[in-house]
Amino acid sequence: MKLFLDSAIIKDIDKRLDSGVISGVTTNPTLIKKSGRVPDDVYADLIQDIGVQDVSIEVDGKYADTLIENGIKYGKLWVDQATIKLPCTPEGIKACKMLNFMGIRTNMTLVFSVSQAILCALAGATYVSPFVGRLDDNGHDGIGLIREIAKVFCHNRTETKILAASIRDAA
C-alpha cells in the first residue's frame, strides 16, 4: 500500500514528507493554479528540491498526439520521478498505450467504472485513479468500486496499481 499526497503547495508537501509514509504526490491544473505558481516550477521543486520520487503530472491536451507530446516532455525530463497523468477517455487511453510502449509511467485519472479501469490496465497504465469521493457524492459506492477493480486486477494478475482519488474523508 502507498499513500500519495494530492497538493501543489511545496512547503505543505515538504512538511508531510518528513512523516516517512508519503510515497508520492499527485497534482492537477486546479491545484497548481491555487498555488499561484508556474507548473514547471512546481514540478522542479517537487522533484529536484524536495526529492519526491513519484510525481503525477497531469498534461494538457484533448487528443492523443498532444497528450503524448506533453507526456514525453516530462517523462524524458524526469525519467525516474514523473508519472504522466492522463484522462480516462479514448484519446487518453491511446496516449497511455504509446507512453507505456516508450517506457513512460502513466496514471489514468477520472476512472468511474471497472470497465474503464480494465481498458486502462490493458493500455499498460501504471496506475488507475478511481474518483471515490465524486462517486460517493453522486450516490454510488466509491470504495465498493475500488474493491471490484482490485478483485478483477488480482484475478487477472494485472500489474496496474489502484490509486484511490478524490477521497473526501478518512472514514
Task: Describe the predicted segments one by one.
Residues 25, 32, 110-111, 165:
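Long, contiguous hydrophobic alpha-helical segments, chiefly transmembrane helices and signal peptides
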Residues 90-96, 105-107, 114-171:
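Catalytic alpha/beta core domains of metabolic enzymes, predominantly
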